[in-house]
């Protein structure tokens, strides 16, 4: 049927996961939260990037939810085996290899792990209009429907090695590009009040994002709900007219057109 005011979703979401040894056991909760929530997506695009010393795009921005769910479910199944030392001890060689294959490409720099700023910039590069270097991001090119962009950054903010971008520099770039970055602490509960965690909280919030610790039982779901609530408003101009895929409508229109054409042709013969 014809809908003169069909709303087009305007959200792009990148899941940006730290897969260093200290953060990897907690990533499954983030993935599982989005697996549950993706059921309610209608036109949103979602992508997944993982990083340690270097980054790998697991899947780019897509609204192919079948593909996204398949990739997220596979990752959730894999990471279920590394959530505790006892589970790690029970892994078979095949499972070790599958996890290693999934992480391939994230540790290409020697003597460096968990380069948070670099990982965040790589995640931002998945979003339309982001350009490396601060001079250009003030002029971010907006897509046709002015899509909003957000990143969910899950990390414990424990850096080891020299970064190209600090977390602050990366957040400055994303803010200039009008990309919202929300932070999720992915680390051991006893380290929640460490300087690195408090610094991450301060930087995320000062750049307009939400910071939560996923050690609270429902905090991952709360973060997801807050992101969804933030982006539910459709920008002006995002409504468009559209025909649904209804063959009955096209048959009626075709018949109507033929009738009109025959009437005109008959009148012209007179």
Short names for language-model regions:
Residues 6-13, 21-52, 59-74:
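…and closely analogous acidic/polar surface helices at protein-protein or active-site interfaces
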Residues 107-114, 118-126, 130-150, 154-202, ...:
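VWA/integrin I-like adhesion module and closely mimicked acidic/polar interface patches used
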Residues 18:
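Residues that scaffold, gate, or flank divalent-cation-dependent active/transport sites
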Residues 35-46, 73-80, 124-132, 175-176, ...:
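Sec-exported extracytoplasmic/periplasmic mature domains
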Residues 12, 203-247:
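Juxtamembrane amphipathic/hinge helix adjacent to a transmembrane helix
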Residues 24-26, 56-60, 159-164, 191-195, ...:
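Extracytoplasmic/secreted cell-surface and envelope-processing proteins
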Residues 46-104, 196-201:
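Short beta-strand-loop
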Residues 1-3, 233-270:
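C-terminal signal-anchor/stop-transfer transmembrane helix together with its immediate cytosolic
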